Structure formats: C-alpha cells, structure tokens
C-alpha cells in the first residue's frame, strides 16, 4: 500500500524486500544529494516500559544486544549506500536519533543500535550528515559537535518537525543536550532545508503553519 500511494517505481528494489526503506538521489550543477529513507518500525524489537511513567516519557532502555531497530538486511543496505558518492547526505528516520535525555520513542530506547549508527558513520567516513525526524509532535534543531566524545569525527545534525495537523507533544523545554535553540517549538510546524552548494552550508529551518520561520540553524557540511 505504501509503495502504491507514494508511486515507488515498479522496478525499485524497495518493492521486492520486507519493509519500506529506500534511497533517493538529486543532482544540481554537478552536486549530488543523497536522501536515505530508513524504516525504523518493521524490523524493530520490543520497547521496554519504565516501572513508573515519568515526566519525560514512559519508555526505558532495551539493553538486549540482540534486539534491533533496522534489522540485519537494512543495516547491510545502509552500509553499502553510505559508501556511494554524495556531496550531502540526509538520513530520514521516523524517530529521533540524537536525543538521549527523554523517554519517549527514540533511537536511545536501544542504545546499542544508536551507537552502531554512530560507529557506521565513522567507519564509512561519511562526513557530516543531517537526520530529519518526526514522531514527537513538536519541532527542534540539534547538533552533535565534531568534538563531542560520541561524535563519529564529523558533526551530526538533526531537525525534528511535528505533523502538519497535530502538535503539542512532550514538554516545553524538555531536556535535550543537543538542542541548539533555547527551547522546542510546540505548535504545528514544518521543516525546510536550504542548501548552499558553494559553501556546503545547509540552513535548517522550522516554520509555523503560516510559513514564518520560527527557528533556524546553519549546518556546516564542509567539515
């Protein structure tokens, strides 16, 4: 149903395998943009509940090293794709990747899988990447700096946006050590990425439902 609705080409490998992960390429003026679309639901193991729900969410960390987010085949595919040439890479994930301070759905529900992603970015020498995510019913902009002990060697950026019809998730100003703006944006919003190919700067923008920019941050992908 997903492939039919989004008109996935009939000859696409995405139609012949479990899950809905895929990749798209866009080229302009000799520059190449790679957009990796991950499936973080189909293969994901169980989420563990906290004994008592806290202010920042109901989920605990699943420390079972055998539990996966992407599944073996998708991890292998991702490693192969990250080694293909691209000037800028964007990774789309339905759940937040960088945050580690809340207990809603996020990659940190499975710390070993989040670390596996960072290790893969380091091993493939991918360079700076931008994650785009949703699920949280709010918006925020983030950066894992190159100098951070968890960094894969280059900065990792993330833009989370709400749905177009629903917002108000989480807590205003909930903890997030990687957020680069004073707080999160609780009203309905959408995101824009403005790419300057000459400087390798990507301006991440959060916009309200009227199109007004309410937050922005420049991601330096030349590092």
Question: Which role does the model predict for each range below?
Answer:
Residues 1-223:
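Long, structured stretches of catalytic cores involved in phosphate-ester chemistry, encompassing
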């Amino acid at each position: 149903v997903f492939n039919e609705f989004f008109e996935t080409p009939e000859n696409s490998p995405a139609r012949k395998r479990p899950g809905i992960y895929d990749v798209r390429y866009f080229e302009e003026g000799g520059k190449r943009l790679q957009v990796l679309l991950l499936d973080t639901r189909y293969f994901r193991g169980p989420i563990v509940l906290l004994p008592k729900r806290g202010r920042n969410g109901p989920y605990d960390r699943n420390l079972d090293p055998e539990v996966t987010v992407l599944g073996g085949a998708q991890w292998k595919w991702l490693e192969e794709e990250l080694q293909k040439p691209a000037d800028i890479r964007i990774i789309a994930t339905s759940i937040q990747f960088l945050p580690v301070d809340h207990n809603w759905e996020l990659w940190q529900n499975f710390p070993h899988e989040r670390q596996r992603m960072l290790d893969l970015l380091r091993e493939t020498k991918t360079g700076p990447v931008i994650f785009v995510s949703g699920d949280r019913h709010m918006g925020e902009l983030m950066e894992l700096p190159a100098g951070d002990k968890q960094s894969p060697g280059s900065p990792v950026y993330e833009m989370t946006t709400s749905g177009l019809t629903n917002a108000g998730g989480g807590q205003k100003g909930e903890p997030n050590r990687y957020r680069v703006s004073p707080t999160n944006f609780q009203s309905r919003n959408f995101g824009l990425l403005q790419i300057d190919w000459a400087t390798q700067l990507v301006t991440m923008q959060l916009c309200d439902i009227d199109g007004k920019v309410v937050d922005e941050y420049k991601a330096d992908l030349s590092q």
